[in-house]
Structures are given as structure tokens and as C-alpha cells.
Amino acid sequence: MNDDRLRLDLAALADEVSPVDLRDRALRTSRRLGVQRAVATSAAAVVMLGAATGTAFALMPRDDGPAPVPATTPSTTLTPTPTPSEATPTTTASPEAAVSSGAAGPTATIGRVFYGPQRSAEGAGPVRLWSFRPGSEPVRLLSVPTDAAISNAVVSPDGERVAWVDDSSYLHVADVDGTDARTYRGNLVDPDCWTPAWAPDSQRVTVSRVVSAEPSMVTEVGVVELSSGKFTRIGDLRGCHPLWSADGKVLAFPDASSGRVTLTDQYGRKGRSVPNLGGNADRSCFDVASLSPDGSRIALRLRGPGEESGDVARELDVNAVLDTRTGRKLDLELGGRKLLQAYFQADGTLVARVGVGDRNVLVLLDGDGRKISETPEPTSLKGQQILGVAD
């Protein structure tokens, strides 16, 4: 068998165990089974692809499809490859704000809010992301696959880049206007559970890669240095949808089984759980959205007794903000309006999205939950969900 035939056979086998099948099955089963199947499917593909590519992440020119549409600790190497893309005007990023505990003054403002499709829009085709800064019109950004936009796409803290994992479990990074698109190959990464999370320097992301499937399942969580593709393992972590605090010192994630939320340091050590959440408590959490700059507060989706845990897919809905040290629910000055989503900014303020009639409103709160200001959200964005907020 010649080399070309071998590569074709391996590619065909990998297609048969594509993570697309995992996604469909995971969405029809319990969260725990979904996580197990996610790992199993990705690992099987890695074993077959490994014969041709090895275990190193490789950044190579992307040749498996169109680039994103522009807008008019042991380590291994995941080498990035630039993807040619059409030059287009770029949006302007504001300077990164200093990290604060949340004692914001009256001059605090809402930064750039980034939007993507809601879960009801799942599909195979590409979809545009958008940004909105109060006082300006919404800006159309790059397009990414719909499933990735819903399940794992995440905007960097500086608002300059987007990271996502595609249907083949490859990590992608591109500027928000679609330029400088890169695909990281060689290892498959988890697209559904341990989804990408940016480091506060906007130069690294944490991912979970599948190392092998035989004789037993082996996965590892680590950090990818995007400039070089270097992958460094950070700990034996098990959970979903991680968040990284703006001060760089805290990782937070649901454990995906008992309803607990775990916090560790940036190296995956010194683990603790949010009190009175999960296990035998009457509240649980399987979905988190945002972590305060120092890791002391977290915006999440609380579930009550007997409430279904949902599936493995990411949910960005928020109905509470908790103190991670006490488990106490923070009182938010929202005027009786329903909380839909919430994101912390690097200065410690909180951007809360609330529903008001036929449109939504963005409310800026200080670190104690007191209202600073609010602004109506454009009606064109009502059917979108917020993916993040950058200063």
C-alpha cells in the first residue's frame, strides 16, 4: 500500500468516527454520557490520525475548506498555519483595562459586547458574529460554522480574536474581521465539554486534547501558546466549559457530573468547590458564563431540585451570580427585570442583559450589584446570544 492510499484510508476512517456523530448523540443523552462519548469519539480519531501525523499540534496552511468569511509540565508543539484570507477593514479595539476587584466609579462604561447565534440556530453552515458598543451601531464580524459559534466559539479578552473548534475537532483562531486565520492540526481537541478558554493575555487558550484511546482513554488539559503552537499540560482536570479570571490566577469550571463548580489556580492545583452547590445540595450547576477578575464571583445557570441537568453542549444563559467563597447569591439591582445573561469586565463591573418587552437592555452594575447605568440593546440583536464582553 503506497503512502497516498494509506492517507486516504486513514482520512476515511477518521470521517467515520467524526465528532459530528458525537455531537448528535451527546445532545440526545444525559450530560454525563455525552461527556464520555465526546472523549471516546475524539480519541478514536486521534489513534487513526496519529499514524500519519503524530501527536504534535501542527499549524499548517488550511486546505480543507474556505477560510472564515471576513467582514466588509510536559509539552508538545501544535504548530499554527496561516490561512489566506481577504483583507478587510478591521474594528478598533480599546485599550485593555486594568484588573479591579469591582469597586467601579461613575465613569465605568460597557465595553464591546460580542454576539453569536442562539442554540435554536444549530446547523452546518457558517454564521456571522457581531459586536456592539453602546453609542455605536452593531458591527458585522467574521463568520464561523454555526455549531462552533453556538458550542465553543470564544472572543479574546482584548476583543481582537476569536477561537473555536470545528466539526473535525481542530482548533481555529482568527482576527474578529476574519483575517489572520489559523488552523492548529495534529491533535484533536474537545469541541463540546472542555471548550476553549482564553488566558487574560489573549495569547494563549486552554484546551483538552485526546492523547490515546487504547488500552485506556487518555486526555489531558493544557494551554496552547498560539504563536508557536506549544501545548503545556496544566493538571489532571475533569470538567466542562472552563473560565479564566482576568488576573490570570483562577480557573473555574463545572465538574459535569455532580453539579459542583470547581476552582483551581492557573496550574490546575489548589482545587476547591463553590459551597452549597451540587452533590447533596438543593442547587446544582452545569453551565457557567463568566468569572470576576479575581475569581471571587461567578455568573452561572443555577438549577433547582429535580431540574434536568441538560446536555453536554454549552449554555450561556445566566440566572444568578454567586460568591465563590460562600456560595451566597449576589443581589443585583435590575428593577425586577429578568436576568438573561451576565459578563464581568476586567474592571470588576458586571454587564447584565435583561429582558424588557420586545427588546433587551444592557445594565452595568458595580461589584456589589448596584446599578451604574443602562442602555437599550439594538432590536436586531435580540435573537442573538452574548458570547463575551471586551473592554
Locations of regions flagged by a protein language model:
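Short, solvent-exposed loop/turn segments at conserved positions within beta-propeller repeat blades
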Residues: 121-125, 164-166, 213-219, 254-258, ...
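Beta-propeller fold detector
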Residues: 139-144, 182-187, 231-236, 271-278, ...
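Short coil/turn segments at the loop-to-beta-strand junctions that recur within blades
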Residues: 145-150, 187-193, 236-242, 277-286, ...
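Blade-level signature of beta-propeller repeat domains, shared across WD40, Kelch, NHL, RCC1
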Residues: 356-391
